[in-house]
Amino acid sequence: MKRIAFVFSTTPHGSASGREGLDALLATSALTEETGVFFIGDGVFQILSGQTPDVVLARDYIATFKLLGLYDIEQCWLCAASLRERGLETGASFIVDATPLEPEALRGELDNYDVILRF
């Protein structure tokens, strides 16, 4: 079975990309257990807690990321450099238990996947 990586690299409420990626991730998890999730660049905002999307009239799909554990999706990583660049390395609270990795280590993890889908 192919290993599939989902890379979230966009902000959560600027487009439908994050929501569509999450839908694809949950659907794919029914077909394979070899799934990894990566949050890089602005994608680190996808799982930042305390967001209020209703202020910009957006749907709060962020809470759906909490379901990853129920779908047995446990391989989640954050880009440590992206966190630093956005001032999120200390005190930030995330709704998913994701492991921060430096870019080189993150690339090493991504190399373990056969298919990479970017949202």
Swiss-Prot record:
Q: Main site of residence?
A: cytoplasm
Q: Looking at the keywords, is Acyltransferase present?
A: no
**Tell me, which GO biological process terms does this entry list?**
tRNA processing
This protein's species is Citrobacter koseri (strain ATCC BAA-895 / CDC 4225-83 / SGSC4696)
- List the Pfam families hit by this protein, alphabetically: DsrE (PF02635)
Question: What transmembrane ranges does the database entry give?
Answer: none
Task: Describe its partners and assembly state.
Answer: Heterohexamer, formed by a dimer of trimers. The hexameric TusBCD complex contains 2 copies each of TusB, TusC and TusD. The TusBCD complex interacts with TusE.
Q: Tell me which UniProt keywords the record has, alphabetically.
A: Cytoplasm, tRNA processing
Q: Name one GO cellular component term.
A: cytoplasm
Q: What is this protein called?
A: Protein TusC
Q: Which InterPro entries does UniProt cross-reference here?
A: DsrEFH-like, Sulphur_relay_DsrE/F-like, Sulphur_relay_TusC, Sulphur_relay_TusC/DsrF
Q: Report the protein's function.
A: Part of a sulfur-relay system required for 2-thiolation of 5-methylaminomethyl-2-thiouridine (mnm(5)s(2)U) at tRNA wobble positions.
Among SUPFAM superfamilies, the record links this protein to:
DsrEFH-like (SSF75169)
Its subcellular locations are: Cytoplasm
- Ranges in a coiled coil: none
Q: Known PANTHER family for this protein?
A: PROTEIN TUSC
Family stated for the protein in its record? Belongs to the DsrF/TusC family.
